[in-house]
């Protein structure tokens, strides 16, 4: 699988431990952003994935967070995090983008969709994308618009743009072809799940 790592340097005035942002594009089809390179207490650098609150709390009553997306295997996690740090450390040579490969050359993926049983909720289903069986993207959803249409929503985060708060997708298809394929796969599985639920209800009568 081919993938590209990009590094974006940022001002550290507001966050002294933040060193840079990173983005990874898989197979020229799907891009994940918002990855951060941070400095630890001992001065070491580490890579952190974007997180979201799960709604649960730990024993100290603190919110529990989970990664929006993450490497599925230890081997790919070690490789990806190491390559991101390497690109960052070599950026002074003018290189802030590197093309890499892992495993098989072909780009393959699959989706998993779980329908929401609360039919009154505007979020109709939750989906995850698994790329190359080594990278997982959570927080994809099927939502109902005000007009009553279902659509696929990508993970987003609240960011300040010119002094205004906006929600921006932090991962998304890069090409129209893959955008249409991915949305089609998710909606197809969503409809299949709905049909199975209808059949199960009819049999239970």
Please provide the spans of the model-predicted regions.
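Single-stranded nucleic acid-binding surfaces, predominantly the OB-fold ssDNA-binding core
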Residues: 1-205
């Amino acid at each position: 699988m081919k993938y590209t790592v990009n590094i974006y340097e940022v001002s550290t005035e507001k966050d002294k431990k933040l060193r840079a942002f990173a983005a990874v594009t898989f197979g020229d089809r799907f891009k994940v952003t918002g990855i951060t390179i941070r400095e630890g207490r001992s001065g070491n650098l580490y890579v952190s994935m974007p997180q979201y609150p799960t709604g649960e709390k730990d024993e100290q009553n603190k919110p529990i967070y989970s990664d929006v997306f993450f490497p599925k295997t230890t081997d790919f996690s070690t490789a990806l995090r190491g390559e991101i740090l390497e690109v960052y450390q070599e950026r002074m040579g003018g290189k802030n983008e590197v093309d890499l490969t892992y495993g098989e050359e072909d780009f393959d993926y699959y989706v998993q969709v779980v329908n929401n049983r609360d039919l009154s909720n505007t979020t109709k289903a939750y989906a995850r994308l698994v790329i190359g069986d080594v990278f997982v993207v959570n927080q994809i959803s099927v939502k109902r618009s005000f007009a009553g249409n279902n659509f696929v929503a990508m993970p987003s985060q609240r960011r300040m743009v010119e002094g205004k708060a906006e929600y921006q997708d932090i991962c998304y298809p890069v090409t129209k072809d893959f955008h249409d394929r991915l949305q089609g796969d998710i909606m197809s599985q969503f409809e299949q799940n709905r049909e199975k639920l209808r059949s199960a209800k009819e049999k239970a009568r």
